[in-house]
Amino acid sequence: MTKQDKDVRAYQQLSTGSFSDPFSFLGPAIDKDQGILRVWVPGAESVYLLVEQERVELEHESYSGFILKQYAPLNEQYYRLAADFSGSEQILDDPYQFHNIYAEYDELHDPKEMYRHMGAQPMTLTRGDECISGVRFLVLAPHASACSLVGDFNQWDDLSLPMQRLDYGIWGLFLPNISAGEKYGFQLKGPRGERLPFKVDPWSFHASLSPHFLSVTFDHSGYQWQDEAWQTREIEPICKQAISIYEVHLGSWMPTQDESISVYRHLADTLAPYVAEMGYTHIEIMPLAEWVDDTGVGQCPVSFFAPTSRYGSPDEFKHFIDCCHQANIGVILAWVAGHFTPHEQGLVEFDGTTLYHHPDPRIGQDQDCHLYFFDYSREHIRRYLVANALFWLEQFHVDGLRVDGVASMLCLDDSRSHEQWQHNIDGGNRNYDASALLKWLNEEVHKCYPRAITIAEDIRMLQGVSEPTFMGGLGFNFHWQVDWVRSSLHFMAALCTEREESLIDMIEPLTSLIGEHSIYPICHDEIAYGRGSLLNQMAGEGKDKLANYRVYFGYVYGLPTKKMHFMGCEFGQNDEWCPSKAMLWQLCNSEAHQGLDILVSDLNKLYRSQAALHELDCDPSGFQWLANEDRYELILAYSRQSSGDDYVLVICNFSMHYYSESQIGVAYEGVYQLLLNTDAACYHGDQGWVSESVESTYMSGEHFDHSVTVSIPPLSCLYYRLI
């Protein structure tokens, strides 16, 4: 093929958006010691070179191509173009003069570095003596035959900016003189040259939802953090910390009517101080990676590196987290790593192949929920997900990640009939590749961010989830105990006269989980999807329902586990949660709901102030049953203790009976002082009589040598501390 034939073919490919090697054809070059400049400007009638003080017209060559021959070499000079479009002249930059857009291997494959190089990265390149600012675009599409950059900067013309195929299946291009706020995306052609749907950037840091879903360039270097005191504070080992988490859906917590202020900024001024005043230690935010469906709650992300723009900008989200930290509140982000949406602009069939999901639908798809599962057997996917986790921790200073749907990641048969799933190599249901990913994820997070907390949402009680990786576990700090919550709520839903048979629901899960690294999650799932509000899951009517609510919370806050509940539970929201509706804050005007609110606040503060209630949550020595055998009295009592001398009794009466002299065995003799009574008048209780302090007496028993005799009102929980 002659050079002329090659030129003709190149122009033909440029004109159809099929050219994969524009650096070999466009831009400045040298031919026989003479400078040549070839540019591609679709729609232009004439093009001029602007360099230093000169203006030189280029010759039209073919299609939309223009060439300048026998000119001084331009290899080291920065130049611009003046193009005439039907009498209107525009000054353009030629991106094909910037060939130095490559990144090193480690920068493109090390999860700690990838998010600093992939996607749209603001940077400055040198051209001759000039430093030119702009944005470099890199996207992985190894099976694509061509890739074009489109955006505001080229009027979404999918022919004007063909990207260069680089190494490792990556396509790249540098656009000079553009900055943050430019909307963009990619137009790709598949392996057979077929035109693919428009794609957003898998690494985009910002997105626009209206009127179309698009990626947006963003510079993460501009925000000035004010949380140094939080980041450098002294802390206990994670398992010994008091952790009380307030789970929040940002869009429905307390919507603002002021459209001039973003949700993120509104919540920085309202949610952060509220959570601090209530005594919580952390906020857990439901998934925030950008999603498309306004009826969803973030469980089906499209842009994994972009906090949803429906609530504000990335910097405004940083401001929200900054304010939380300044209020001494940690922020945990619910993080989706198991699946992605089938939205055609997202990851699905990104380069015309199953680049991100498994080709076998029994492994790669959920036909019922219309989701795609990541193929964890592929190295580029594991790197992408680990890089994403590190990105949220680094760029947004989040204090932890709660990994969504761990059971569905690990179990090939999760929510599937027999014919819908594929066995692993050993004939079992464990997804070994997902296990490898989660181990690596936790190792990288704990190595790079030792203060960060990782939590597994595990509804199947899988073994080893919170064991260290060196012991064969997955390495999470904590895992959810959803079955424990549901069994205890089953007990609380029964009338007091029918609770004898289900008391085991309160005892057995706790007994089997003592010493586990667990969280008791009264999460959004438990008060939605037809289950009803938490308050309405309690037995009884009126005052009895409220009393059941109070004794339940008293029981939960003493358990040897970290705490979490969903927004609205603190004041007894009586409607099932709906993400499109605000919480019923007007309930707080009633004394009954005020009482619940005060109780939860006091429980948070008690839990944090008493080392016995949190220090040994993950150690079997921190918990002991004191009374759990009389199913007719419906009294459960246990002790909590610290590594020092702190010793607290938690005594719960789940019956309608008042016990004036209930004898409870204790491990230590001495005087026990009342810390909290859920039946107190300040919590809108009946203020049944209880002793402010009790002194132990000697008893000859099988388990204890000492006991205390206490009065316990109906449906109440008492906390006593050894003084």
Give the ranges of each region predicted by the language model:
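Carbohydrate-interacting/catalytic domains
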Residues: 1-241, 264-279, 543-546, 557-565, ...
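Hydrophobic residues within beta-strands of alpha/beta enzymes
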Residues: 47, 147, 283-285, 401-403, ...
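Short glycine-biased active-site loop of nucleotidyltransferases that positions the nucleotide triphosphate
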Residues: 59, 293-298, 342-349, 466-467, ...
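Short, flexible loop/turn elements at secondary-structure junctions
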Residues: 141-143, 153, 167, 177, ...
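Substrate-binding/active-site clefts of carbohydrate-active enzymes
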Residues: 204-208, 228-240, 249-430, 694
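Non-transmembrane alpha-helical segments in soluble domains
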Residues: 272, 321, 389-393, 442, ...
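Conserved alpha/beta catalytic core and glycan-binding cleft of carbohydrate-active enzymes
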Residues: 397-399, 414-582, 587, 608-664, ...
